[in-house]
Regions:
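Mobile late-domain/C-terminal helix-loop "cap" segments
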Residues: 251-277
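Mg2+-dependent prenyl diphosphate-binding active-site environment of isoprenoid biosynthetic enzymes
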Residues: 3, 7, 16, 20-250
Length: 277
């Protein structure tokens, strides 16, 4: 725990050192706000852990770790806009404090800041780290696109769902570990192994996150419960429910999924009850 705290403190210190232009404040204030919301800093911690696991000095991986954390928060900022989420980590989301256009543009700025930090990785690992980061970033966009497309489909399979969350969530945890391993001097085989471990960790994380969106405590979860239900997100629970429910339950679930107008709290309660059966 002492080592993790040292890593965490180092990450927070570097995040606090990010330099922003004085103007326009309307671009950079939302970035500072998003990063100030905190979080567990799981991805940068994994990067530093993986670096030291292969006998590297964790400080050599700090720039990459910070870049990954800024990038992760950029994805959350844009996700909140697309999902129309009002709360993130117990605080109003950027698009609620400002507006959607500001949130989109500030998110774009965060993506550029993230790449700037990734590109500061020291030789001889710069090229490999940048290439892996770009591959991961594009895969996350692919996963988000699948997620949006699945909202309009009723025939999403469990296999399609798993591939979607692999791209949307798991590849970033795998990438965080592999980037740290590369900087730490790991062999290609070892770096690939730790990447696969990170992917598995990411899949488990997303499955748990989907469950918490239905059954979690809002105070501990940090955002409103039921957002996935309101957006008809094809989570494992919804896919599984569609396979299990029959008769009137199946009709009720289909009615809620196709409803254009509804009371949000009523829909959340009704669909949750169907999940429980």
């Amino acid at each position: 725990m002492e080592k993790l705290q040292r890593y965490f403190d180092a990450i927070e210190a570097e995040l606090s050192k990010i330099e922003y232009a004085a103007e326009p404040d309307g671009l950079y204030a939302p970035v500072r706000y998003e990063l100030s919301l905190g979080g567990k800093r799981v991805r940068p911690l994994l990067t530093l852990l993986a670096c030291e696991m292969f006998a590297g000095d964790y400080r050599r991986a700090l720039n990459a770790a910070v870049g990954l954390e800024v990038f992760h928060n950029f994805t959350l900022l844009h996700d909140d806009v697309m999902d129309k989420a009002d709360v993130r980590r117990g605080k109003p989301t950027v698009h609620k404090v400002w507006d959607e256009n500001t949130a989109i543009l500030s998110g774009d700025a965060m993506e550029i800041i993230a790449f700037r930090y990734i590109a500061r990785t020291e030789a001889p690992h710069t090229g490999a780290v940048v290439e892996l980061f770009l591959k991961t970033a594009l895969e996350i966009c692919e996963g988000q696109q699948y997620d949006m497309e699945f909202e309009r489909r009723d025939d999403v399979t469990e296999a399609e769902y798993i591939e979607m969350i692999r791209l949307k969530t798991a590849v970033l945890l795998g990438g965080a570990l592999k980037i740290g391993a590369i900087i730490g001097g790991a062999s290609e085989t070892d770096a690939d192994c730790i990447y696969r471990f990170g992917e598995s960790l990411g899949l488990a994380f997303q499955l748990q996150d989907d469950w918490l969106d239905v059954y979690g405590d809002p105070a501990r979860f940090g955002k409103k419960i039921g957002g996935d239900i309101l957006n008809n997100k094809k989570t494992y629970m919804l896919i599984n429910a569609r396979q299990r429910v029959e008769g009137k339950d199946a009709e009720e679930l289909s009615r809620w999924l196709s409803a254009a107008e509804y009371d949000p709290s009523e829909k959340i309660a009704a669909v949750t009850a169907l999940y429980d059966r």
